[in-house]
A protein has these predicted regions:
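Family-specific signature for flavin-dependent thymidylate synthase
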Residues: 1-249
Length: 249
């Protein structure tokens, strides 16, 4: 058994992403048919810088629905089941997660929380529990197999003892608007540390591939200029909403 390490890889994104978003925005405000404009967009006859400027200006007004036409697909590994339980609550997305029924989890990797890792006694207790859990899981599989439950049938019952720390792998697809919402929530310091780390890696990829859409993405305070979380939960990076308004910012 060993500790898992977070890895995020972009598998694919909508081809001609900027042109798709530009065309969608143009269709909203143009009496013409953007299908006729498309060959010029993909043929380089409309300057990408001009497209990006137009998209940025319209997004600034709060019109975001056209960015939904572009999506990103990521492969993620080295995350815990605790993380994926949070992740799949973002409903406007598609997920394909490694199955604990069809995959034998003997010797499973696990995610060790940093705050536990800092305390020697806590780390020892945690790692010993992981070892005991792996032994129990393996023994349960053996007993189930001895009583006629083979392969996935043994896995599906033995998995009930697996912890939330157990490492998982998942493929997810989100459109740009869903990603903007995801980053607003999960890049915030209030977000759980593990999903925040994953969100920041995803954002770095999105920002590199489609900067015009994601240039202001991240925790909500970045776009707002103030912290909307209230005095109890603020991290102090930005002034509170009431403070910001009182100062006229």
């Amino acid at each position: 058994m060993s500790q898992a390490k977070l890895k995020v890889r972009l598998l694919s994104m909508t081809p001609e992403a900027l042109a798709v978003i530009y065309a969608a925005f143009r269709q909203c405000y143009s009496p013409g048919y953007v299908g006729d404009l498309w060959p010029k967009l993909v043929g380089g006859q409309v300057d990408p810088a001009e497209q990006a400027l137009f998209v940025a200006d319209v997004m600034e007004s709060g019109h975001l629905s056209p960015v939904e036409h572009v999506s990103f697909t990521f492969a993620v590994e080295g995350v815990s089941r605790a993380l994926t339980h949070q992740l799949v609550r973002h409903r406007l997305a598609s997920y394909s997660q490694q199955s604990q029924r069809y995959v034998n989890e003997s010797g499973f990797e696990y995610v060790l929380p940093p705050q536990i890792a800092k305390i020697p006694e806590a780390r020892k207790l945690f790692e010993e529990f992981m070892d005991r859990t792996a032994e129990t899981y393996g023994r349960l599989r053996e007993l189930l197999q001895d009583h006629g439950r083979k392969g996935a049938k043994a896995n599906e019952d033995a998995r009930f003892v697996l912890p939330q720390a157990a490492e998982s792998k998942i493929v997810l697809t989100m459109n740009c608007r869903s990603l903007l919402h995801f980053f607003a929530l999960r890049c915030c310091e209030r977000a759980q540390w593990e999903i925040r780390a994953m969100a920041k890696e995803m954002l770095a990829i999105c920002l590199k591939r489609l900067p015009v859409v994601f240039q202001h993405a991240g925790a909500r305070c970045i776009g707002l200029g103030y912290c909307p979380e209230g005095e109890r939960f603020t991290c102090g990076r930005y002034p509170l909403q009431s403070t910001s308004f009182q100062s006229g910012e």
